[in-house]
């Protein structure tokens, strides 16, 4: 298993792309149009409304031109990523003091992530957090993405993990305090909170994992996979959970996590199937530690 782990995480190319691909796809599929607009409730799906979770809302526009520019940006579908990025960048350049900066940057976070532009995603995300510290979705996205994009050779490696830990913990702490918006049903609100918490716990778990704190990582990944409402589970969470379980000699738990990963279609299936087999062998020849 150690050889597989070195190939997939330290050499890093395959899993790094997979890590970013999973969170990028989640951000793109979980985003409707701009999260701060308020179209009629019947025109929004549960997943669209789940992406409006924040304590912060923009104040009234300063002038009609700024208002029109924001509405033009807001009207561009999230699926037209290049056009929406261009419009968002033009908006923040033209209106650097706009009261709409937080929602524009919040959208840019998701767009940059979907485009795998991690540095721009982080820059935009940190601007959002400075403007709207209670934007729990942005906190969770930053908290999950930074440790997934991380490698030990980065010049600011320790600082990046510290930031990810702070973002994830803030999202976990703040999400339960968010009041339900009037436009959301109870089901939509629960979905939004659970999506956010799943990302935040995953991010915090990976921070601990990167630091070699496997016992601390395990409950975070367990909570992430427990609350994640997405019908397509993220195999990466089960994969890293399995390795953490194996590292702490919880071989039966490692087999269970590897098996869940192997059941999810995707590039990790062969690796997780092999991991389950190897964890079974280790469990048969080595003493398991109590959970």
What is the role of each PLM region?
Residues 181-182, 194, 198-203, 207-210, ...:
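Terminal, low-structured helical/coil segments at or just beyond the last alpha-helical repeat
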């Amino acid at each position: 298993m150690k050889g597989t782990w070195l190939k997939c995480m330290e050499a890093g190319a395959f899993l790094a792309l997979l890590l970013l691909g999973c969170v990028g796809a989640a951000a793109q599929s979980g985003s409707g149009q701009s999260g701060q607009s308020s179209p009629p409730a019947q025109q929004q799906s549960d997943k669209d409304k789940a992406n409006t979770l924040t304590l912060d809302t923009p104040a009234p526009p300063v002038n009609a031109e700024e208002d029109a520019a924001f509405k033009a940006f807001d009207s561009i579908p999230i699926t037209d990523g290049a056009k929406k990025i261009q419009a968002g960048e033009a908006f923040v350049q033209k209106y650097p003091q706009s009261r709409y900066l937080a929602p524009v940057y919040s959208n840019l976070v998701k767009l940059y992530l979907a485009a795998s532009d991690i540095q721009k995603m982080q820059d935009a995300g940190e601007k959002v957090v400075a403007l709207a510290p209670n934007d729990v979705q942005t906190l969770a996205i930053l908290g999950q993405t930074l440790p997934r994009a991380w490698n030990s050779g980065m010049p600011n490696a320790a600082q990046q993990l510290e930031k990810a830990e702070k973002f994830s913990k803030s999202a976990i702490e703040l999400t339960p305090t968010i009041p339900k918006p009037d436009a959301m049903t109870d089901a939509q609100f629960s979905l939004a909170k659970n999506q956010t918490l799943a990302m935040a716990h995953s991010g915090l778990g990976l921070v601990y994992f990167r630091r070699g704190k496997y016992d601390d990582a395990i409950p975070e990944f367990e909570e992430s996979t427990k609350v994640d409402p997405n019908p397509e589970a993220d195999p990466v969470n089960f994969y890293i959970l399995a390795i953490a379980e194996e590292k702490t000699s919880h071989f039966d738990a490692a087999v269970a996590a590897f098996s869940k990963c192997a059941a999810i279609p995707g590039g990790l299936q062969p690796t997780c199937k092999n991991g389950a087999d190897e964890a079974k062998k280790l469990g048969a020849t080595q003493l398991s530690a109590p959970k």
